[in-house]
A protein has these predicted regions:
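Soluble cytosolic regulatory domains appended to membrane proteins
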Residues: 4-168
Length: 168
């Protein structure tokens, strides 16, 4: 019984050959996603800090409900003072039982943020998402400053292509 090791260059070459024979662009993109997945970093696919939909820790419950009702996101970073200091992640589903209330201490429903460095490889990141059972990571630069966020959906889309949901 003989075993062999296939490296990424051989897979890339096989993909090039396959691309001439496969007519379906979705199939080609899927194969390309598999090949390039492990080479990409969190910073390659993250949503930059200027695009992060977030909530201030100082927001009232009414303001939070108003903001999430206008949002397409189910997990929202919460910051203190500015986006550089993310203190938690709010899961919209955690507020559903309290949505009819006029006032609620929503801060007690915050979840611990998960931080990763911008050079975190996607193949490692997807394993951490799975292990920690979370869907959102805050991406930090080399100085520890927030530079963006990346979701599990973003990582999966690198393999399978765009996932269209009710908000896309």
């Amino acid at each position: 019984f003989k075993t062999s090791t296939i490296n990424i260059n051989e897979i890339s070459h096989a993909l090039e050959i396959t691309e001439t024979e496969v007519s379906d662009n979705e199939e080609k993109d899927f194969l390309r996603g598999i090949v390039t997945f492990g080479n990409n970093n969190a910073s390659d696919i993250m949503q930059s800090k200027n695009e992060i939909y977030s909530i201030s820790i100082d927001s009232s419950f009414v303001d939070v409900i108003d903001k999430i009702s206008k949002s397409k996101y189910s997990r929202i970073p919460v910051f203190k003072q500015n986006i550089e200091s993310i203190v938690g992640v709010l899961h919209v589903k955690d507020l559903l039982p309290y949505i009819e209330m006029d006032n609620f201490n929503w801060k007690k429903k915050l979840r611990e943020p998960f931080f990763v460095t911008e050079d975190k490889k996607l193949d490692k990141l997807i394993l951490e998402f799975q292990e920690k059972r979370i869907h959102l990571a805050v991406v930090l630069d080399n100085e520890g400053n927030t530079c963006g966020v990346v979701s599990l959906e973003d990582v999966i889309e690198e393999i399978v292509g765009d996932i269209t949901d009710e908000f896309d």
